[in-house]
Amino acid sequence: MINIYTDGSATKSRSGWGWLAVYPEGQQEHESGTSIGATNQRMELMAALRALIWWKREGHCRWDSDDDVTIHTDSAYLYNCWADKWWVKWENNGWRNSQDAPVANMDLWKYLTTFFKDPQVSFAKVKGHSGHVYNEMADKLATGAIKAEEEQWLKIQEKNDKINIELSEILLDYSMKKYPVDETIKRIRKACGC
């Protein structure tokens, strides 16, 4: 039995997902990623989907076919869809919900339901932010992915701000005729790293 802990996270501008697989002998594998503007629920689904794709891909070359997987999630949205078989109703209704509207996150649900049909796959509900070690680790993967992307974006913004300030100074100097055209062009190229 392989246990995989998944989590999704979202801020105003960034979203992240992460999963942590724990082998019976204690070895661990993990993955995380980000998206822009996705909801927390979508990231919960993405974490589970990416984990199951990994499990299936690795399962053919690392474990015998008797290895089952349990996805541990703090998402009621994901767990209830599997446990209460919402997905069966959606499939039978042309991927429309009980209000006859298209199912939210349908693209991800369609992939996830292929795993729901696999008897080796099960889901377990865990309480979020309750101190469960592996669930907390999955949460840190999801939130850490967002933080890493935001830090990278801030570094790029800081660099761009410095370039913009330098270019403004160069153009101001040019407008005040402090430097000739050819010297101004050299300074612009240097500022831009050209």
Language model segments and positions:
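RNase H-like nuclease fold core
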Residues: 1-42, 46, 53-56, 82, ...
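A two-mode feature
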Residues: 126-127, 138, 142-164
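Charged/polar low-complexity intrinsically disordered segments, enriched in acidic residues
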Residues: 155-190
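Residues that form generic nucleotide/phosphate-binding pockets
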Residues: 111, 115, 141, 145, ...
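RNase H catalytic domain
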Residues: 6-14, 30, 49-137, 151
